A protein has these predicted regions:
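Conserved ATP-binding subdomain of kinase catalytic cores across diverse folds
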Residues: 42-145, 163, 167, 179
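An alpha-helical support segment within catalytic cores of ATP-dependent transferases
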Residues: 139-162, 230
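Active-site acidic catalytic loop and adjacent metal/ATP-binding pocket
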Residues: 18, 63, 76, 153-193, ...
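Regulatory N- and C-terminal appendages and interdomain linkers associated
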Residues: 11-57, 62, 68, 244-275
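Bacterial N-terminal signal peptides that target proteins for export
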Residues: 1-8
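C-terminal catalytic region of ATP-dependent kinase domains
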Residues: 66, 178-275
Length: 275
């Protein structure tokens, strides 16, 4: 048994599969978040293209940004629909990024507010990816055997995040998969729901319409941070981008999540749920 444990540790080191990197932005990306936030805010717009079609429901803009010899793309959107069946707002893009930072989840690319053509909107650094989940499914691309364990944990983190922010629009095009099989999450403009549908039940549980989709394995430190969240702390982090009602709804979901995690621990055992 000891030899097997040593062998597993060796494999993880050889393939560079440290747990935080399996489902998150690279450490250097996290360390440079302030740099990218400033870049998104201050860089000159030297190119622009409005995206349309099936994969661009909100018709966002792909902006080419340049500053100090560096050039990057940014995704800008200004949709702001507060009524109807599917409320949709650029403000929730920024709020989702800030909640991601608050929890040190590190799965959402840098996102800030920026004016474009005189309008307020959100702009997110363009995330480079090998494919989307849609491509993976349609082309029947298998997850490499030595990545399956980490890929599954990435999906558990995605479910955790979407449960908390009440994201009802996690379709296959906004799961971005990198060349080394990390998972990046984009498109959160249909999050932070306040209706009973999103405060009485969680989106991802064993009762999911497409079959059981549980938060089956989670970092203990992440669950501790979830427990430690306060409305005041969240308000300080998200600022004007969430209303008091949206924050209240998020904490109703937080409480449901803690109950769900306790349920999973009883079902599978604490050592199998928290790592």
């Amino acid at each position: 048994m000891k030899k097997r444990a040593c062998l597993l540790a060796f494999i993880l080191i050889v393939f560079g599969l440290a747990l935080p990197a399996a489902a998150q932005l690279l450490p250097e990306d996290v360390a440079e978040r302030a740099k990218w936030e400033e870049f998104l805010t201050a860089a000159e717009i030297v190119g622009q293209e409005q995206l349309k079609g099936e994969g661009a429901v909100t018709n966002p803009w792909k902006l080419t940004l340049a500053k100090d010899g560096l050039q990057k793309f940014g995704l800008w959107k200004n949709i702001d629909i507060s009524t109807g069946r599917y409320p949709d707002s650029w403000k929730w893009e920024i709020a989702a990024y800030r909640v991601d930072k608050l929890l040190d989840l590190n799965m959402v690319p840098a996102t800030v507010e920026r004016r474009f053509r005189g309008d307020r909107g959100s702009i997110q650094i363009w995330a480079e990816a090998e494919m989307t989940l849609k491509t993976k499914v349609e082309k029947k691309i298998k997850t490499p055997s030595y990545k399956v364990f980490f890929w599954n944990r990435a999906l558990f983190l995605q479910r955790f995040f979407d449960n908390l922010i009440g994201n009802e629009d996690r379709h296959q095009n906004n799961y971005l998969i990198t060349a080394d099989w990390r998972l990046i999450l984009i498109d959160h403009s249909r999050s932070f729901r306040t209706s009973k549908k999103f405060t009485k039940e969680l989106l991802y549980t064993e009762k999911h319409p497409e079959g059981p989709m549980e938060m089956k394995e989670l970092p203990r430190v992440l669950v501790d941070k979830l427990k430690a969240l306060t409305p005041e702390g969240v308000k300080a982090a998200v600022g004007e981008y969430l209303t008091d009602d949206e924050i209240k709804a998020m904490f109703l979901r937080r409480d449901l999540m803690l109950l769900e995690i306790d349920k999973l621990i009883k079902k599978y055992g604490e050592e199998n749920v928290l790592y």
